[in-house]
């Protein structure tokens, strides 16, 4: 009996964790932490690191859970998401709402009391931008949902910067612009090979409303824009030669994927492009951090 109770508790924990979309949240937290380190010449305080990381992670997880609550009917008709706890009936809407509220409230309280009020307010605005403006208003209404809603997804390094310094610096906005330009080709690559599922769900993603060829062209165009934007930190003196080389190589590879996708489409290639985009962003920010501590003048 005790063994069954333990197994049941473990299963329930897994169900709640599934609401948090931990793989997505991990990239959010990673870019936020990089923002903390880039904001100061040496190291941010350990208090800033642990409290900022935990607080931002909790609020990001709350936003993910709220997204699952709002989109449970959509998730039920998509192969990629139908195994989530809400479509399967493993959790109720009330349980999910309470869970999201506890996570979000705890994260905001931690940020306000241990980090600084600015970070708390920016994180709250990011939550509203994703969970309400993007999920509720933009996603079901316009094929430009990703472009407009990408502003909330681009905020994590700004949150990290604010956590470390208590201010919004123009260099933090460069990090914002990089993720903002990265978001459309990242999500449109996913939407291309999931276009039939999005169509069944009634979501106006770009491949559904404007067609495959149009979307492939815009993936390519945004990879070109992303390369240009990613070089801005070099132009402003924020980053040096090490970052320059890394940004050019990573960006050129992303453009290569975009060009290949534009010329001849396959679901497999779109899937590889999507996966590369995740690796690209993580690697770009890691190289920027390395350049920060081991600068080589351009």
UniProtKB/Swiss-Prot annotation:
Its placement in the membrane is given as:
Multi-pass membrane protein
The protein's annotated pathway = Porphyrin-containing compound metabolism; heme O biosynthesis; heme O from protoheme: step 1/1
The record's Gene3D superfamilies line, in alphabetical order, gives: UbiA prenyltransferase (1.10.357.140)
According to its UniProt entry, the protein's GO biological process terms are: heme O biosynthetic process
Q: Which domain of life is it from?
A: Bacteria
**Name of a matching Pfam family:** UbiA
Q: Which UniProt keywords apply?
A: Cell inner membrane, Cell membrane, Heme biosynthesis, Membrane, Transferase, Transmembrane, Transmembrane helix
Which GO molecular function terms does the record list? protoheme IX farnesyltransferase activity
**Where in the cell is the protein located?**
Cell inner membrane
Query: Where does it mainly reside?
Result: membrane
Catalytic activity from the UniProt record: heme b + (2E,6E)-farnesyl diphosphate + H2O = Fe(II)-heme o + diphosphate
Q: What EC number(s) is this enzyme filed under? A: 2.5.1.141
Has UniProt tagged this entry with the keyword Transferase?
yes
What are its GO cellular component terms?
plasma membrane
Where does the signal peptide begin and end? none
Instruction: Please list every transmembrane segment annotated in the UniProt record, as residue ranges.
Output: 24-44, 46-66, 97-117, 118-138, 146-166, 172-192, 231-251, 278-298
Q: Which InterPro entries match?
A: Protohaem_IX_farnesylTrfase, UbiA_prenyltransferase, UbiA_prenylTrfase_CS, UbiA_sf
What sort of enzyme, by top EC class, is this? Answer: transferase
The record's function comment reads: Converts heme B (protoheme IX) to heme O by substitution of the vinyl group on carbon 2 of heme B porphyrin ring with a hydroxyethyl farnesyl side group.
Q: According to its UniProt record, which protein family does this protein belong to?
A: Belongs to the UbiA prenyltransferase family. Protoheme IX farnesyltransferase subfamily.
Other observations noted: Carbon 2 of the heme B porphyrin ring is defined according to the Fischer nomenclature.
Q: What is this protein called?
A: Protoheme IX farnesyltransferase
Naturally occurring in which organism (per UniProt): Thiobacillus denitrificans (strain ATCC 25259 / T1)
Gene symbol of the encoding locus: ctaB
């Amino acid at each position: 009996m005790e063994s069954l109770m333990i197994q049941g508790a473990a299963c329930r924990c897994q169900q709640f964790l599934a609401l948090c979309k931990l793989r997505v949240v991990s990239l959010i937290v990673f870019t936020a932490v990089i923002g903390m380190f880039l904001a100061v010449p040496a190291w941010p305080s350990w208090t800033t690191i642990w409290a900022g990381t935990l607080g931002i992670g909790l609020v990001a997880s709350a936003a993910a859970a709220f997204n699952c609550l709002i989109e449970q009917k959509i998730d039920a008709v998509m192969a990629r998401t139908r195994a989530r706890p809400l479509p399967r009936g493993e959790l109720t809407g009330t349980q999910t709402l309470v869970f999201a509220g506890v996570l979000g409230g705890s994260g905001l309280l931690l940020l306000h009391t241990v980090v600084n009020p600015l970070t708390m307010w920016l994180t709250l605005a990011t939550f509203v931008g994703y969970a309400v403006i993007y999920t509720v208003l933009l996603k079901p209404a316009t094929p430009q949902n990703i472009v407009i809603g990408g502003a909330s997804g681009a905020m994590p390094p700004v949150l990290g910067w604010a956590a470390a310094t208590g201010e919004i610096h123009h260099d933090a906005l460069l990090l914002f612009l990089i993720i903002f330009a990265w978001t459309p080709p990242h999500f449109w690559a996913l939407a291309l090979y999931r276009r039939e599922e999005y169509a069944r769900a009634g979501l106006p993603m770009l491949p559904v409303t404007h067609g495959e060829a149009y979307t492939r062209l815009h993936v390519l165009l945004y990879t070109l824009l992303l390369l240009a934007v990613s070089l801005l930190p070099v132009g402003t003196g924020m980053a040096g030669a090490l970052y320059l080389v890394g940004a050019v190589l990573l960006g050129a590879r992303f453009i290569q994927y975009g060009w290949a996708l534009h010329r001849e489409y396959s679901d497999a290639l779109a899937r590889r492009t999507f996966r590369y985009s995740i690796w690209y962003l993580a690697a770009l920010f890691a190289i920027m951090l390395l350049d920060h501590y081991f600068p080589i003048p351009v």
